[in-house]
């Protein structure tokens, strides 16, 4: 893994950084140690805002929750952008 984040409820989010031909993922680990796919990079840009390319294989990095635990922020290494993800977190293991 590239980095990880402890969620407000004590679970983990693990960011992949591998050299495989698969899209990079964020993997969750619940309080019992079970892992599950949480998010997968699916970023392909066709010139929007000046960026073109297939970025599915670029790593997630710098994942963290807002202070109130309502928003998860994650960065995509290339082309370099941040996403904000909201729950409902209480409905799942994170």
Where do the language-model regions lie?
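Sequence/structural signature of beta-propeller domains
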Residues: 1-94
């Amino acid at each position: 893994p590239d980095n990880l984040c402890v969620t407000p409820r004590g679970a983990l989010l693990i960011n992949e950084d591998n050299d495989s031909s698969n899209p990079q993922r964020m993997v969750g680990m619940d309080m019992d140690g079970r892992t599950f796919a949480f998010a997968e990079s699916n970023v392909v840009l066709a010139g929007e805002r000046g960026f073109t390319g297939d970025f599915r294989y670029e790593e997630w990095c710098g994942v963290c929750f807002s202070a109130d635990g309502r928003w998860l922020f994650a960065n995509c290494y290339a082309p370099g952008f941040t996403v904000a993800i909201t729950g409902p977190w209480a409905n799942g293991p994170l």
